[in-house]
């Protein structure tokens, strides 16, 4: 069981407990071994096969459980495998209520479960609590949300979601994808969620040099099911990736803070140019701002931008130099993309349109570069696109 957090999150990120290396290495060693020798048949050791357990992975999981305010944490090969392991806790024909503005890969996996296992999935605008409540049934098995959502950056009241779910579907698993905020800015388990998961590829690692997923829970029963699924499917993170993730986590506080401060300036800058910008807290008087800061400690560093013209958006994306055209977010470098053509292209256009995922939507993921350089890059892109303020 992980230790309770004793210090501020910035300190806890750096100090890793549970390293039992016999040589007292200050950095957790990479146990790059598929199997482990046993002392004898009668007394098996703590580890036998890396698919089931590995010393490097064990230290990482204890560290993540502490940071995510969980009793148990598990690391998987990528973020989608983390969600897959969670969904495998549900039986065939389960009823799922999920946000309608989800990461495209999550939407694709839910659609697969609809076809393959008879899942009944209702996608709703989770920022509309009345619509969310109407979608719930007494036999709802799982609720899946993001806040902020990806890519529109809509805010849903994660506290109210818990209260409504417990009153209408008390046995449903409450699951939140916290990738946008990371443990530095939000701890959903503190608000009553059964499971929180993240793509470790993003802020947790921070350098786009590994693929990984994290699942955290306070429930022994859920942990037992999740571990069985990971072990049975062979979905656990490999030792080298565990080492990289342990290293990346140590600087996450600094990275998130710098990227977040840059993002605040970039959001204000783009808004001043007449663009529609969705970014948490950009409008201090908006109701969504008060809701957001009831569960988050900062806005993060991802925003959605609407130009009103697809060709203008394409020119902006193609013209930037420092903002690299790429999917993903949460690394030290700034990225830019058009979700309708990239991360959410697997969703049919008519469905995207119904969910407000317009073709002109640009997702900007701000990194830790000099903010004046970033603004100059965007200024030039806007000029090249001949964007005119309405």
Swiss-Prot record:
Keyword Transmembrane helix: no
Keywords on record: Amino-acid biosynthesis, Cytoplasm, Lyase, Methionine biosynthesis, Nucleus, Pyridoxal phosphate
GO cellular component: cytoplasm; nucleus; peroxisome
Pathway linked to the protein: Amino-acid biosynthesis; L-methionine biosynthesis via de novo pathway; L-homocysteine from L-cystathionine: step 1/1
This protein's record includes keyword Lyase: yes
Chain positions with N6-(pyridoxal phosphate)lysine modification: 202
Localization, UniProt: Cytoplasm; Nucleus
Highest taxon in the source lineage: Eukaryota
E.C. no: 4.4.1.13
Necessary cofactors: pyridoxal 5'-phosphate
Catalytic activity field: L,L-cystathionine + H2O = L-homocysteine + pyruvate + NH4(+); an S-substituted L-cysteine + H2O = a thiol + pyruvate + NH4(+)
PROSITE patterns: CYS_MET_METAB_PP (PS00868)
Single GO MF annotation: cysteine-S-conjugate beta-lyase activity
GO biological process: 'de novo' L-methionine biosynthetic process; transsulfuration
First-level EC class: lyase
Family membership noted in the UniProt record: Belongs to the trans-sulfuration enzymes family.
Full protein name: Cystathionine beta-lyase
Organism: Schizosaccharomyces pombe (strain 972 / ATCC 24843) (Fission yeast)
Gene: str3
């Amino acid at each position: 069981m992980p230790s309770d957090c004793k210090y501020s999150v910035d300190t806890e990120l750096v100090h890793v407990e549970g390293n039992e290396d016999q040589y007292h290495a200050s950095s957790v060693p990479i146990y790059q071994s598929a199997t482990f020798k046993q002392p004898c048949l009668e007394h098996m050791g703590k580890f036998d096969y890396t698919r089931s357990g590995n010393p490097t992975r064990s230290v990482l999981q204890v560290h993540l459980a502490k940071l995510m305010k969980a009793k148990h944490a598990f690391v998987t090969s990528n973020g989608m495998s983390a969600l897959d392991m969670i969904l495998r806790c549900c039986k065939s024909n389960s009823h799922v209520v999920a946000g309608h503005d989800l990461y495209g890969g999550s939407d694709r996996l839910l659609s697969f479960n609809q076809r393959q296992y008879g899942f009944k999935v209702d996608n709703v605008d989770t920022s509309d609590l009345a619509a969310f409540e109407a979608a719930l049934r007494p036999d709802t098995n799982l609720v899946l949300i993001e806040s902020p959502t990806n890519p529109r950056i809509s805010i849903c009241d994660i506290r109210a979601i818990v209260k409504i779910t417990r009153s209408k579907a008390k046995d449903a698993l409450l699951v939140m994808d916290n990738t946008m905020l990371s443990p530095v800015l939000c701890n959903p388990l503190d608000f009553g969620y059964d499971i929180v998961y993240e793509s470790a590829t993003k802020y947790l690692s921070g350098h786009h040099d590994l693929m990984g997923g994290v699942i955290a829970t306070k429930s022994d029963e859920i942990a037992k099911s999740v571990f069985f699924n990971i072990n049975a499917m062979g979905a656990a993170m490999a030792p080298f990736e565990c080492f990289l993730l342990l290293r990346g986590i140590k600087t996450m506080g600094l990275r998130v803070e710098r990227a977040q401060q840059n993002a605040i300036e970039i959001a204000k800058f783009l808004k001043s140019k007449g663009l529609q910008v969705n970014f948490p807290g950009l409008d201090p008087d908006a109701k969504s701002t008060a809701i957001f800061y009831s569960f988050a400690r900062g806005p993060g560093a991802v925003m959605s931008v609407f130009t009103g013209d697809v060709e203008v958006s394409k020119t902006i994306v193609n013209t930037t130099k420092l903002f690299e055209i790429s999917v993903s977010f949460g690394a030290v470098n700034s990225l830019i993309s058009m979700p309708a053509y990239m991360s959410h292209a697997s969703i049919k256009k008519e469905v995207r349109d119904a969910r407000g995922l317009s073709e002109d939507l640009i997702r900007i993921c701000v990194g830790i570069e000099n903010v004046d350089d970033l603004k100059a890059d965007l200024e030039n892109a806007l000029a090249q696109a001949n964007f005119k303020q309405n």
